[in-house]
Amino acid sequence: MLQIFTNKKNIALMAFALMCIMANAQQKSVTLTQAGTLSSQITAEEKFNITELSVAGPINGTDILFIRQMAGTDNEANTSTNGKLTHLNLQAANLVSGGDSYYFVKKGTAKKGYGVSENNLVDHYMFSGCEKLVEVKLPASTQKINNYAFFGCKSLTSCVIPASVDHIGDNAFAQCEALKNIQIPASVATMGNAAFNKCAALETITFDDGCAITIINANTFNGCTLLKGVKLPSTVEELGKLAFANCSSLTAFTLPASFADKESDTFQNTPIKNYDVEEGNEGFSAVDGVVYNEDTTELLLYPIAREENSFTVPTQVGGIGEQAFFGAKSLKQITLSNKLTNILSKAFAQSGLTEITFPAEVTSIGKEAFSGCKALTTATFKGGPSGISEKAFFGTGLTTVTFNQMNAVPELHQQAFLTARTTINFFVPADKVDAFKQGLTAANAVSPTRFEVKPLTTSSIYGLQQEGSAVEVSRFNAAGQRISAPVRGLNIVKMANGKVVKRIEK
């Protein structure tokens, strides 16, 4: 009997709670004939209880402030109300200039107010910080979405961007942490910096057919950690600084047909395993997932999340681009092309390389080219480069650096060889020992790391000539399938010197 009574009591409590929820979930539709009058159409009791609101007719800054308060946020950052509004439909509304300021930004001791400055403009900070908003449908007549319009709307999962919008401003949707999908209409011609920065839940971005955007600006999708794929319009020519950085779920990327330029750190810390280039691109090419210039004489982008621990640079390559191998942690060994002359800044920075041999034709090593390669212990130069730039080997594990030939001491720059090791041994031709010591000291290239400069012996040269002959290039299983690591049984291993070795792995 007691159990029955308890169950009935629980059911009654649940029913009461449900009634309360339903009572609080209020919907309202309002049609205005004059901007600034929304508050006259909604009672004080309704203001903080309405959860779904549809507005038609003209609205201005005064109405936007009222809507913000209904959505739990006042006219400054981190100021809240008791509002419960989660769903806002403005498709039949028209934004008109004028009315009160709906948002204030502190600048020193002063405050700057923001309101609706133009017709059909979702202006600066319009819904910024409205953390309770879940869905927003903008006026069908909207032409622009200005800077910070939805910044920090942490619960926003959906925003319908009208087909009339031609611009999305800086940080417009930045830190909308719940936004899962976004559709960019064909009308959008420009997007500002960091437009979708740190939208951590964003999985897909769809650009409508006909979208003619030409630039993906700096930080646009930086920190979109769930973004799995994106197909850019073929009109995109440029990718900005950190545009797709820290996108930890993005593993493949296709460069558009019009693509012509990118910043060196566009994909920083993004685990790309394969790059492709859209058909029709006349400036770039992709071979086995690696990006080169059109005639494959310069290697520009290596997919840093590849599991292979070795890579052979094609024989025709004469240059390695900025940050080409940046952060390639799995890469332990690399065989460079004998035609290679230039290695640009940060080309191999923070990679997993353990040793490196530079062909005789290499003339310059760029700034921070190998910085942060903590596993790198040995560097061998078959010739004498003309210059080694600032911090080229900064923070590596180098213990031995060998110069096989040296017509003149390279131009050494500050901290070029400053490492985590206590001592670095430099081997140089005997007639260059004193000059090389002076060069290291004058440029402050090593200090405070200790170093010794020793004459190169015949045995050192012989060892150098053998360098790389035993480097593994690729590996296959017994069925002829390429593998990234040893597997049990027969392994067929191709070496850098052209030899093929059969190994039995246990």
Where are these regions (language model features)?
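Short, surface-exposed loop/turn motifs with a glycine/proline- and acidic-biased composition
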Residues: 477-499
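Residue-level detector of functionally pivotal "anchor" positions at catalytic/ligand-binding pockets or at interdomain
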Residues: 455-482
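Structural signature of tandem-repeat unit edges
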Residues: 27-33, 51-59, 77-102, 107-120, ...
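Terminal processing/anchoring signals of secreted or surface-associated proteins
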Residues: 53, 291, 436, 459-464, ...
